[in-house]
Design a protein with these regions (language model features):
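Generic secondary-structure signature for well-ordered alpha-helical cores
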Residues: 7, 18-25, 49, 75, ...
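Short charge-dense sequence patches
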Residues: 14-25, 47-56, 118-122
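Canonical Radical SAM [4Fe-4S] cluster-binding loop centered on the CxxxCxxC motif
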Residues: 29-65
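Short low-complexity stretches enriched in small and charged residues
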Residues: 2-3, 37-39, 68, 99, ...
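Core AdoMet radical
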Residues: 51-66, 73-100, 104-135
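Flexible, acidic/Gly-rich N-terminal and inter-domain linker regions that tether
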Residues: 1-43
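Short hydrophobic/aromatic-rich motifs at helix boundaries and adjacent loops
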Residues: 41-43, 70-74
């Protein structure tokens, strides 16, 4: 069985590589990760920035600090930025929208991904206001 499993595994790997090559080619995508806040309203036990972790040194980057990060990343060749943080109530939908617009204004050819925990549908739709277009 082990020998057969190995044969099946090799065949599965071969087919998976063919599909990967057809769909994605031989490229690597690099994203600039900006961890702009480690405040979080949640208390997920596994998470280092959970609310009850009194050893975490809390921070929030200013808009200017975040924009400096994107400027530096852009100079280094990054064209996708991930804004990542805890579920920080200080960063309202309005603040996030302003931040995304500021980044888009400085770097219109860049993609922006948000990793901010759970948000409601209105948050992602900009409360009826269109978000800046992605390239």
């Amino acid at each position: 069985l082990i020998q057969k499993q190995s044969e099946y595994q090799k065949e599965a790997e071969k087919r998976a590589n063919i599909l990967r090559e057809q769909n994605f080619g031989n490229r690597i995508y690099v994203r600039g990760l900006i961890e702009f806040t480690n405040y979080c309203k949640n208390d997920c036990y596994y998470c280092g920035i959970r609310k009850s972790n009194q050893n975490a040194e809390r921070y929030r980057l200013s808009t200017e600090q975040i924009l400096e990060c994107t400027d530096t990343g852009y100079e280094l060749g990054f064209r996708t930025f991930v804004l990542q943080g805890g579920e920080d109530a200080w960063y309202t939908d309005e603040r996030i929208l302003e931040l995304v617009c500021a980044i888009r204004e400085r770097h219109p050819d860049c993609a922006i991904t948000l990793s901010l925990g759970e948000r409601n549908r209105d948050s992602y739709e900009g409360r009826g206001r269109p978000l800046p277009a992605s390239p």
